[in-house]
Design a protein with these regions (language model features):
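Membrane-interface junctions
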Residues: 92-93, 131
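Short coil/turn linker motifs that delimit alpha-helical repeat modules in TPR/alpha-solenoid proteins
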Residues: 59-62, 95, 134
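Extended HEAT/HEAT-like alpha-solenoid repeat tracts in very large eukaryotic scaffold/adaptor proteins
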Residues: 23-31, 38, 63-69
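Ankyrin-repeat helical core positions
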Residues: 32-36, 72-76, 91, 107
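Short linear regulatory motifs enriched in tryptophan with gly/pro/ser
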Residues: 2-26, 38-45, 55-56, 75, ...
Length: 290
C-alpha cells in the first residue's frame, strides 16, 4: 500500500475490502485526491491528519500513510523544505507507527528526487537507528543509512540471536536456532530448511515486520529478479531486532509455506563451535510435499 507510487507512477492501490459507500472508504478516497494535489498550503492539514489518526479508527494505517506520503509528494514536486521539516518533526513523535512512516517517507523524499541526504539529517537518522525503542522506526532509519552508504550499527557484536521458528500450519512443532550476529538471513534460511529436514529448492522471502507482502520489510532469495534487497545482504546484528520481535518466513510461493519466527534471546557471548545450530526442538517436522 503506497499512495506515493500511485501519485508518481500511477500504480494501483489495493485497499482493504469494504463497502464503497462506507464513510471511512469515502474519506480515504478524498484524502488520496487531496494528496495528489501536492499543495504546500495543505502541509498543516497533513501534519494534523498524521497525529490525529488513532490506531482504533477505521483505515487508520491508510490515512496515516497517505498523510506522510502527501508531505513527501509536496517535498518532491514543490521542493518544499517546510514539508521536509514536518516529516523530520514527525520522526520524533511518541507513536512508533507515526515515526516509522515519517522516516520511511523522509528517505523517499530524497531518493525519489535524486537529492543527497544532508549530514545533519544523517546524524539524526543514526541516532534513531541506534536508540529508537521500536523495531520499525529503527529499521527504517537503518535502511536510509544503507542507501546513503553510511555504516550500519552492529547490535550485539560477537554475540548470538536465538530464533524460535514455528510452521504456521503446525504450531505444535518448532525449532529454536542460535545464529551469530555477523551471519545473514540467508544463513538462517538455509539452516531453517536443514532443521525441518526440507529441501531448499524454491524461492523465499523474509518479512521483518511479520506482514506478508510488505515490500518495505522484505528480503528475498537472490534468485529472484528485480526484488532486492537480498537475504545474503542482511546481517542479523545490523537489522535491529529487539527481544520478543516476530518476523515471517515465506518459502515456496506456490505451496505458500509460512513460518513465524520469534527472537527469544539476544546473548552477548557465544559458545565455541559452528553456527547456526539447533538449541531446542519440539515435534516432528511437517511434510514438505503434500
Amino acid at each position: 500500500y503506497d499512495p506515493l507510487d500511485k501519485w508518481l507512477w500511477n500504480t494501483p492501490i489495493p485497499l482493504p475490502p469494504t463497502t464503497p459507500t462506507a464513510p471511512a472508504w469515502q474519506d480515504t478516497q478524498h484524502l488520496l485526491e487531496l494528496g495528489n494535489l501536492a499543495d504546500p498550503q495543505l502541509i498543516p492539514f497533513w501534519r494534523e491528519t498524521a497525529v490525529a489518526t488513532l490506531p482504533h479508527n477505521s483505515y487508520h494505517y491508510e490515512h496515516l500513510t497517505i498523510a506522510a506520503a502527501a508531505l513527501t509528494l509536496i517535498a518532491i514536486r514543490r521542493q518544499s523544505e517546510i514539508a521536509i521539516h514536518t516529516l523530520r518533526h514527525l520522526t520524533n513523535n511518541s507513536r512508533p507507527d507515526i515515526r516509522e512512516l515519517a522516516i520511511h517517507y523522509l528517505g523517499r523524499a530524497y531518493t525519489e528526487a535524486g537529492r543527497p541526504f544532508p549530514h545533519t539529517l544523517l546524524n539524526d537518522i543514526t541516532l534513531i537507528a541506534q536508540h529508537d525503542t521500536a523495531f520499525e522506526p529503527r529499521y527504517q532509519a537503518r535502511r536510509i543509512l544503507q542507501i546513503a552508504g553510511e555504516p550500519l550499527p552492529l547490535d550485539n557484536p560477537n554475540g548470538v540471536y536465538d530464533f524460535k521458528v514455528t510452521p504456521m500450519h503446525s504450531r505444535r512443532t518448532y525449532r529454536t536456532i542460535a545464529i551469530r550476529s555477523e551471519q545473514t538471513l540467508r544463513d538462517l534460511q538455509r539452516f531453517i530448511q536443514h532443521a525441518f529436514e526440507w529441501d531448499n529448492d524454491h524461492l523465499y522471502s523474509f518479512y521483518l515486520n511479520g506482514r506478508k507482502y510488505d515490500g518495505r520489510y522484505r528480503f528475498s532469495s537472490s534468485y529472484e529478479e528485480n526484488r532486492p534487497p537480498w537475504a545474503y545482504e542482511a546481517i542479523i546484528g545490523q537489522i535491529g531486532f529487539p527481544l520478543g520481535h516476530h518476523l515471517l518466513y515465506h518459502f515456496d510461493y506456490t505451496a505458500d509455506h509460512l513460518f513465524e519466527i520469534e527472537v527469544t534471546a539476544i546473548r552477548p557471548q557465544i559458545r565455541a563451535g559452528n553456527y547456526p545450530r539447533i538449541i531446542a526442538d519440539h515435534g516432528k517436522p511437517p511434510a514438505q510435499y503434500a
